[in-house]
Amino acid sequence: MGLRPLMVGALGVVYGDIGTSPLYTMKTALEWAGGADAETALGMLSLIVWTLLITTSIKYVAVVMRADNDGEGGILALMSLLGIKHGERLGVIAMGLIGAALLYGDGAITPAISVLSALEGLKSPLPQISPYIVTLSAIILVGLFALQAQGTDRIGKLFGPVMIAWFIVIGILGLFGILRHPSVLAALDPRHGLSYLFSHGMTGFLVLGAVFLCATGAEALYADMGHFGARPIRFAWYGLVLPCLILNYAGQTAVVVDAALGQEPNPFFALCPAALQLPLVALATVATIIASQAIISGAFSMTRQAIQLGLCPRLNIAQTSATGYGQIYIGFVNWTLMALTLGLTLGFRSSDNLAAAFGIAVSLTMLLTSILMFLTMREIWKWNLAASLLTAGLFVVVDMSFVSANLMKVLEGGWFPLVVAAVIFFLMMTWHQGRDLLVKKLERDTLPLATFIAQVGAKTRVPGTAVYMTSRLDVVPVPLLHNLKHNKVLHDRIVLLRVVTASTPRVAPDLRIDVEHVGSNFHTMTVRYGFMEQPDVPEALDQCRQRGLIFNMMETSFFVGRVKIVAERRSRFAAFQAHLFEIMHRNAMAATEFFRIPPNRVIELGGQVEI
């Protein structure tokens, strides 16, 4: 696909969040600053512009997007790039999990604050509708989440053109605002922002939390890199998004300096002539829906990564498009996000109230990304210590400023994403640690495969092929031992199959399968998938034809273990965690269904394991 279509696609998916931030950023910053006077407005504009330049243009577009994992981005991809397979990288795993958990909290807030802020633009032209804005927002959000299962293949093609129209409109509105008061462009000088910060004490510090709202969508540039590539995202940012954002924020500042707010408290809508107010609200509502859609799709994509990396229980993943692999639907994630988003909408009831909750999650994720980037600079890019400390250190200082300012608003709403993130992090760590402990327990009394094959001798064989799913190919799978113990027979051909998730998003077809004959008609097979791919075992077996191994599915039986978890009295796990892991394990999607194995060819052999 050419550069232009990819740029249009990126504008419809990547830039929805950061592109709709002008709806509430300047308004919130002025309110937190305690006034809408000219000096304050110029200070806010300077801080907003330089936040966009430092955090988005320099940190993400110029530096972080270079840290791709085989083309894929996002904090989990970065975590995988740094090698989570090594036991000593527990700190890297923890940072990746915390960052991902925080983004789920942010994912619940973004749709609520975006849709509310757009519909609040109706208050001036249609004041009689004000009491119904929360209800209308809830209806729109319910409709958005309800449609997820149908996919966005068709309507998604309109997202890019709509967002192009959005950026052009807000850029033109901003330009007309600047023409009324061109002197606001002096605020592009960073000294205006620094002067405000250092001359207003605690207020200057706290207002950074509101200023940060302009950059909350910056993480999406990195997270969605795998869908469009770094080059189209960079071109779209510098060619359209950044200029239009700066124009609009400058135009809003001009309205404030010109004392032209009137009855409209939001400088964004004050930019617009009264006759065009309703069309602007309609366009803003559509843009916020697109931004919300991007957040929801991102949550689905991140969940699939977590499942493939073994950080989350298997969940049912539905493909909603025959052509777009990234278009998936995960019901559990969708309905959980909807419940959280509706709770926020009905509980906080306005974008002003939600602003205090917004920002803390993303700022913490950005801080963790900066720390992981330091490791990337040292270990992957082989930068010297001085260059790594200077670059990552600058990012950490900026991120810490925003995190500290946002933490001051924890009691006013910032607690919500932190609580959501803490719960999700605890669940993911419980699953990760529980799986490791379970695997060790299962492998404790295993028999070496070579020894078993040497002892097989003249065991009774029955026609057909038996495929045993296993995590190790050097030992005998427990289901095979159970089958031999109870049925006293072996199949003519036995395949030990291990499915491995690579630390890359995708695996090349010629590297997907390894097959080895180990004697007595035993074969070991490794099938590799990237953490962005959906495993399909029957398809992998069909690809073995070119390696001389032919499978007839009607003559092939798949043996899998079904384990019942029981908590030990003196477990390494806390009793509560052990019971929680048991519940998660019991309710996880069956391995056979996840790997797309025909259910009529599956034989489950159970056992009990204490952890």
UniProtKB/Swiss-Prot annotation:
Q: Which InterPro entries match?
A: K+_transporter (IPR003855), K_trans_C (IPR053952), K_trans_N (IPR053951), Kup (IPR023051)
Q: Where would you find this protein in the cell? A: Cell inner membrane
Family, per the entry? Answer: Belongs to the HAK/KUP transporter (TC 2.A.72) family.
Membrane topology, as annotated: Multi-pass membrane protein
- The organism's superkingdom is given as Bacteria
The protein's predominant localisation is membrane
Residue intervals passing through the bilayer: 6-26, 44-64, 90-110, 129-149, 158-178, 193-213, 237-257, 280-300, 328-348, 354-374, 385-405, 410-430
Question: Function of this protein?
Answer: Transport of potassium into the cell. Likely operates as a K(+):H(+) symporter.
Which organism is the protein's source? Bradyrhizobium sp. (strain BTAi1 / ATCC BAA-1182)
Q: What is this protein called?
A: Probable potassium transport system protein Kup 1
Catalytic reaction list? K(+)(in) + H(+)(in) = K(+)(out) + H(+)(out)
Q: Name one GO molecular function term.
A: potassium ion transmembrane transporter activity
HAMAP family to which the protein is assigned, alphabetical: Kup
| GO CC aspect terms | plasma membrane
Disulfide bridge partners, by residue number: none
What are the entry keywords?
Cell inner membrane, Cell membrane, Ion transport, Membrane, Potassium, Potassium transport, Symport, Transmembrane, Transmembrane helix, Transport
